[in-house]
């Protein structure tokens, strides 16, 4: 499963369509069920309709309507993936509108169907919770090396010895 990110296209001179073809993606946003969970993949690379500079980081009204429809049809706990964050500045420019959708489509008990949103755009590791939804930023494929002053021990001594750069990501 793939999530389109800004570095996958413009940074390397590829169009969204070329990137999707290379990854064999049939759709740029989609959902699927696995075991007892529902997964939604969003494309946060739509052009912003307002005057904008920089890379595209917007979710279109067409995609928002699809999201509402998709969420309303599932009864399973849902995890949302997007390259750009749905909670932080520098993420999806209309993130507050998207969060409102995620928070208002609830299960019968009134709890949000969405339990977590994962992203990686900010190249950092952290978790933030907003209105009962966990927003998880993962630095798993980052080119951001923070250096000796920010070393962090989280693996066994053997792994740290064999892969010393892990402590600086």
Could you describe each region identified by the protein language model?
Residues 70-89:
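Short acidic, glycine-rich surface-loop motifs adjacent to enzyme active sites
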Residues 1-68, 72-73, 97-114, 124-169:
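Extended active-site neighborhood of metal-dependent phosphoesterases/phosphodiesterases
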Residues 5-6, 83, 120-121:
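Active-site glycine-centered loops adjacent to acidic/histidine catalytic or metal-binding residues
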Residues 92, 96, 121-122:
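Alpha-helix N-cap/helix-start capping motif
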Residues 88, 116-119, 124:
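A sequence-composition feature that detects small, non-aromatic residues
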Residues 9-13, 87-92:
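Acidic-and-aromatic substrate-binding clefts and catalytic sites of carbohydrate-active enzymes
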């Amino acid at each position: 499963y793939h999530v389109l990110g800004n570095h996958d296209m413009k940074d390397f001179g590829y169009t969204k369509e070329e990137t999707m073809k290379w990854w064999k993606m049939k759709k740029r946003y989609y959902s699927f069920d696995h075991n007892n969970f529902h997964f939604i993949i969003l494309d946060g690379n739509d052009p912003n309709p307002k005057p904008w500079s920089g890379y595209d980081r917007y979710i279109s009204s067409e995609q928002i309507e699809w999201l509402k429809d998709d969420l309303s049809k599932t009864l399973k706990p849902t995890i949302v993936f997007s390259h750009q964050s749905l909670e932080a500045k520098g993420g999806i420019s209309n993130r507050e509108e998207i969060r409102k959708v995620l928070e208002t489509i609830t299960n019968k008990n009134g709890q949000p169907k969405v339990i977590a949103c994962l992203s990686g755009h900010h190249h950092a590791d952290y978790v933030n919770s907003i209105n009962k939804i966990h927003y998880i930023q993962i630095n798993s494929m980052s080119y951001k090396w923070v250096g000796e002053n920010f070393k962090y021990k989280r693996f066994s001594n053997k792994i740290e010895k064999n892969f010393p750069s892990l402590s600086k990501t």
